[in-house]
Amino acid sequence: IPAMVEQGGFSAPFSTALMATSSSIAIVIPPSIAFVVYASITGTSIADMFMAGIVPGLLMGVALIIVVMLEAKKHNIKPSREKASGKERWDAFKDAFWGFLMPVIILGGIYGGIFTPTEAAAVSVVYGLFVGMVIYREVSIRDMFDILVDSAKTTGGIMLIVASASLFSFVCTKFGIADAASNLLGSIAHNQFTFLLIVNIIFLIAGCFIDANSAMYIFIPIMLPVCKALGYDIVAFGVMATVNLAIGQVTPPVGVNLFVAISIKIKKGLEVTLQEISRAVVPMIAACVAVLLIVTYIPITSTFLPKALAKEGSYTGDQSSV
């Protein structure tokens, strides 16, 4: 953010809003915890979900690039430095190569049948430690304790949220609340268009207040039966839900990413208020909503890649395979 403001010439509210919005795309780009949670609830393949998130995630990134280009043109913002040479780009690629290799190992290993998603998590940890300690030499043995403590805190917090959401989902199912809500939704939505429109609205609102994993546990069991009954691809449905929740994280007035972004200190005497970032984030939300509509009503944008890579009969999104 400071670099965009001081060197790039962008306004502080715009820069802060851009960082908040772009960071929310992380739950759409594999490997995504939200996809793992969705797959565990619905029984879809984690590999299918990971592959399905690639194109929508890239589309969201392209949409934000367009917003930045329009902002730069509107305020006549010129490049703050010369274009990198071929050698500089190659050097940067070589420095980042080992980091780029991790998602390739995870996704390639899962989709190639070399290891399961759980094993992929273990492999990625070992690989990350190897790269950090041996290749980049930024991690030492002395850092291990702090790393493990931070990991335990993060994992513990996530699992506490997931446990609470799972308990809520269990209570709803036990007392018939989930079935009643599902029947109500089915009675209102008689076709895919209406159903998807209602679901989008629900998830956009839910994403403002609840983190993606909790929202999955609460709403997916209610919506999935209707989704299946209407014949909508459940892998595409999972991607659509995740994109919704990503947008919800930056939707005013309670988008959690907005509060994180405005807490970042840009420089002394320059702070961004919630009102300022709420105005600045509007075009970015509009761009992401445009992508959401494409993903929702043209599901092939998220399904063609997993279908193309899946072995015959192994794709888990089609209703015939559920």
What residue spans do the PLM features occupy?
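Alpha-helical transmembrane segments of multi-pass membrane transport proteins
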Residues: 1-322
